[in-house]
Amino acid sequence: MIRTNFFLKQARRHEVKAKSSKKHRSDDTVDRDHSDKIRDRLNSSENGDEKHRRKEKRSSRGKSYSRSRSRERRHRSRSHDRRKSRSRSREKKRRPRSRSRSRSKHRHRSKSRSKSREKKKRIEKPRRHSRSRSQTPPSPPAFRGRNAAMDAQEALARRLERAKKLQEQREKESAEKQQEIAAVAAAGGGSVINVAALLASGTQVTPQIAMAAQMAALQAKALAQTGISVPSYYNPAAVNPMKFAEQEKKRKMLWQGKKEGDKSQSAEIWEKLNFGNKDQNVKFRKLMGIKHEEEAGTSSVDAESFKTLKQQEEMFRNMDAQYEMARSQTHTQRGMGLGFTSSMRGMDAV
């Protein structure tokens, strides 16, 4: 009986202690959950990169749990018996469940919070964008109806076209007036009379008109003197009519055919030139292009031309004699040296 009572008392004590340890454990888990919630709130209130901070939370949670476990183990190993060590093993089995539950809860909460934050940020982004747009200058309104700038450009283009047309008309009128003035000047005698006629008619005399009248008067004068008029395709202000008439005369003289009776005195002298040798005379006439070989007498030639012919014959004879002497001394007498001593003396004597 005594033994049974003793065992019953011990069993009751053990149950009481187990209940107290369970209560202590439940209080510890509640405190941990509460501390984790506070930490989550503090961490969620901070701005920044959420993913990086979640990783830090997980690592910090693991560390805190391990620290709390080590403290509890030390405390219990010092103060409790082996029976309590059994309860420790039970706690070890139960703790991962509670930890996983608490973690899952916290994760779920953190995910929901992060989603709500992301939604808030997404909602806030267009607002910020709208603020930046309001700060920038407003875009120009869409084109509706007429644009003032385009109308002004079109009006300017029309004015330019009108001005061009007016200028072309004025140029045509001035060209026609100049042609009329030139025709009047060619028909009339002098420039003064034409200018006076223009003044009388009421037309305004410009420097260009006066210049055209002067040129027309010069053309009329050249036509009267030479009989050659300046063609219409030449600019009368750029061509001198007198010089043009002289050039035309030269062209006619150059390209017209030669007449048989027209022979100059120099041509007759060259034809009757005599070198003293018949073969040389024939060669010379061929070179000069003299076709006929008529030997004219002294009666047909003038006294002056006869004298010139005689002088030419003497000159050619002397040249032949000198050539023969030089040839004989340079080519045949090479034994006398280089030809600068005795041969040169012989040349001096000659």
From Swiss-Prot:
Composition bias, Basic and acidic residues: 25-51
Domain of life, source organism: Eukaryota
Keyword Cell inner membrane listed: no
Keyword Ribonucleoprotein included in the entry's annotation: no
Chain intervals with Basic residues compositional bias: 10-24, 52-132
Coiled-coil boundaries: 146-187
Keywords: Coiled coil
Region listing for Disordered, in residue ranges: 1-146, 328-350
Entry similarity comment: Belongs to the RSRC2 family.
Protein name per its UniProtKB record: Arginine/serine-rich coiled-coil protein 2
Provenance organism: Xenopus laevis
Encoding gene per record: rsrc2
